[in-house]
Amino acid sequence: PIQAGLEEIIFRGYLLHALSLLVNNRVFLALSTASIFSVVHLSNPEPWNYGIGPYLLAIFMMGFFLSTITLIDGGMELAMGLHIANNLWVHLVVGLENSVINTPSLFLITTSNIQYESIFLPSLIQFSIMFVVFGLKYKWFNFNKSSKSISPASLI
């Protein structure tokens, strides 16, 4: 949890904020921080053991989602909590045989090659559901013009 929390402070706290002082485009901010987040994770053994492309896609999608919810919510608490929950899940519940953190998991994935389709669609569905749940819970979107919430058009 400490490592994931520190990553969020670095990427969604300092880096995202620093880039926002230079560029006023939320899409660019989310894409750039997610890209840097992905490249940093290449130091882990997973991309080299299971496939660089699918691994980078998974990390990029996670980084993009975390950056997006940070930009919309205005704070990094959700991203930090989600990142910690994700890391606990992948290391304690469903682990990889050759992981950066070797811990006993309830289930162990023993494949030697992860495919794109096993990453993209499940991640897209998962992040879409979380986005809707968070949006409703925290009233991110204004579909009624009299409210002070942000409108979907202002995200771009």
Residue ranges and their predicted role:
Residues 1-153:
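Transmembrane helix-loop-helix hairpins at the membrane interface
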